[in-house]
Regions:
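Small beta-barrel nucleic-acid-binding modules, primarily SNase/OB-fold domains
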Residues: 21-163
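Bacterial N-terminal signal peptides
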Residues: 9-19
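Bacterial N-terminal signal peptides that target proteins for export
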Residues: 1-10
Length: 163
């Protein structure tokens, strides 16, 4: 009788776990940086997890020929991404795009550099309210140093200025 209860419990746990919708998808390929700071990997648009990239003025990198122009965060991402990018998909958005934690310069022995953290520590992104604590700490450090968007006026779409 005891053996039967253990097997029944095991089967129940397996059924519950298999019915949960878990995003374990990982994409790894060359990434194209879109004007809004999203990435295009394998024909999928990926928003970087935990951050909002505010609109900034258009700048041009004239050290390249032809000059590369775009939002400051997009230019920073293009500078950082020199090879393949690996993204761990966290969720799918209603428009079909994905949200994920993306890493550049990764290897078998190193997970690489978190692109959301990279933008936050340079001041080109804002941590969302539900972002990890580390992201909020990086945002505060960039803000205290007056880096990136903290030197110019921006809109924070999730904060009501009339409160």
């Amino acid at each position: 009788m005891k053996h039967y209860k253990v097997n029944f419990s095991l089967v129940t746990i397996i059924l519950l776990l298999s019915s949960m919708h878990v995003f374990a998808e990982s994409l790894s390929s060359y990434a194209f940086v879109n004007d809004d700071g999203t990435l295009s990997i394998k024909n999928k648009t990926i928003h970087l997890y935990g951050i909002h990239i505010p609109a900034t003025s258009i700048n041009c990198r004239t050290s390249q020929q032809p000059p590369v122009c775009g939002e400051r965060a997009a230019l920073a991402l293009e500078f950082k991404i020199q090879s393949f990018v690996r993204c761990e998909v966290m969720s799918e958005n209603p428009d079909g795009s994905l949200t994920g934690r993306c890493f550049a310069n990764y290897s078998n022995f190193d997970e690489g550099e978190d692109l959301s953290a990279y933008l936050l520590e340079r001041g080109w992104a804002i941590a969302l309210p539900d972002a990890p604590f580390e992201y909020h700490a990086l945002e505060r450090i960039a803000q205290s140093r007056g880096m990136g968007v903290w030197g110019i006026a921006i809109d924070r779409p999730y904060i009501n200025p009339f409160r």
